[in-house]
Amino acid sequence: MTPQDFYRTLEEDGFSLSSKQKEQFDTYFKLLVEWNTKINLTAITEENEVYLKHFYDSIAPILQGFLANEPIKLLDIGAGAGFPSLPMKILFPNLEVTIIDSLNKRISFLTLLAQELGLENVHFFHGRAEDFGQDKAFRGQFDVVTARAVARMQVLSELTIPFLKIGGKLIALKAQAADQELEEAKNALCLLFGKVIKNHSYQLPNGDSRFITIVEKKKETPNKYPRKAGLPNKKPL
């Protein structure tokens, strides 16, 4: 998918990019490739692949109608090089984006990236989701939490749902069908008062299958969740 294909596909979906937004995606690509030589950000560095498998893939929840250009508080867990939240932010500037990542070098990259792209209302924090999930400044504060290929739902639910307001939504982007994952996550979702409201499949323009699972938080998360760092992964609920 060339940049021009990317612009055209978005326009066909009703999203006509301004010259500023096109420049932001171009700068994003260049900085991603440049920084990838210093720290491991991505295995995908060829321009057409980045536009398809990072940029287009990241904004899929918007294209599929699951997010609006509103000043909602969005948290991205384990965003790595900023996916999916920063491409979403470029497309929908009204979003207020917070990223938590466990690697400080990635936070350095994201901080510089946001400055170079001129993004406002973006916040980056270094640390573990399990620790921030017990911090009152973060817990129960977000309208949406996104996670792209972070962990299976059984683990992911404990890392994300505590951050949501009641009625808030987890948007999980997956490359594989989530049916088996959701079966395994039934107990975790029950304990965390999360309800799957949508399990959506779609295709990238090249025909690759992708999946979005949306979980709504129904009640306040019990205080003991999330458990200490590492436990959700070692002993899933």
Swiss-Prot record:
GO function terms (MF aspect): rRNA (guanine-N7-)-methyltransferase activity
UniProt-recorded name of the protein: Ribosomal RNA small subunit methyltransferase G
Ranges that cross the membrane: none
EC nos: 2.1.1.-
Function: Specifically methylates the N7 position of a guanine in 16S rRNA.
Organism: Streptococcus pyogenes serotype M3 (strain ATCC BAA-595 / MGAS315)
Primary location: cytoplasm
Uppermost EC category: transferase
An annotated GO cellular component: cytosol
